[in-house]
Swiss-Prot record:
GO biological processes: coenzyme A biosynthetic process
Gene Ontology CC entries for this record: cytoplasm
Origin: domain of life: Bacteria
Gene3D superfamilies hit by this protein: P-loop containing nucleotide triphosphate hydrolases (3.40.50.300)
Entry keyword annotation includes Transferase: yes
Protein's name in the database: Pantothenate kinase
Pathway: Cofactor biosynthesis; coenzyme A biosynthesis; CoA from (R)-pantothenate: step 1/5
MF terms (GO), sorted A to Z: ATP binding; pantothenate kinase activity
Subcellular locations according to the entry: Cytoplasm
Amino acid sequence: MARLSEPSPYVEFDRAQWRALRMSTPLKLTEDELVRLRGIGEKIDLLEVEEVYLPLARLIHLQVAARQALFATTADFLGEPQQNPDRPVPFVIGVAGSVAVGKSTTARVLQALLARWEHHPRVDLVTTDGFLYSNSELSRRNLMHRKGFPESYDRRGLMRFVTTVKSGSDVACAPVYSHLLYDIVPGEKQIIEHPDILILEGLNVLQTGPALMVSDLFDFSVYVDARIEDIENWYISRFLKMREGAFADPASHFHHYSTLTDEQAVFAARDIWHSINRPNLIENILPTRPRATLVLRKDSDHSINRLRLRKL
């Protein structure tokens, strides 16, 4: 592991150093399962799961146990009853990063691996897309052109949801977003029932502010990182694949893109990237990277080659 010459709260690893921390953690994920978890354009394989994600799952597993011991100590100090071992305080993980960087795949792989530990089998994954304001509300607020930026989210609703989960409520409900419709699905909810671990994945989950923010409730956080130029290329490549896939569905909000030529599609994707996604990354998402417990740094081929762990 690399230690910076100046005092630092971080410790950096190359992949070989990190994989040694897997110890004897077994791989319980099959190739078929990984295919279903892999996002569009992602190239994660079982070797990367073994060398990157298993050590990460082991670290989180250890931190879950330590966090529960801390809660028990606090309860003892307050003279409160010890928590029910069958209903521990949920451990909340935030996963952040740019559009097209692969954070959704990271979140899904983590969910699959963590759920295989017998001490925390109930692992739920929620994306913050469901907390975007509906298109009608965004239009009313004149924010459609800012969709995905922090102000386009119901941040109070998101905070209430995570607080409800973390406080041990029997049920918490999250709105559901449809990428096909490009809007919130009216009346549809994702039901969360006292999980052992909650993974919250989204662009802006690590944001801070003058008031309590959802990031203040995280027990662990991951930022998926890459060069901006690489993410742009991945976004354009994904756009071209979606033009032939999801966009081809007549019900898709983006169906009009399905008839574009390659040249037209690349132009459209690059325009969206530079007018929306790149500014959001630079202004809002990238500045939150130092807050992450762990930064996963990707190379141009999508492989994770370096990691930075916050130790303080």
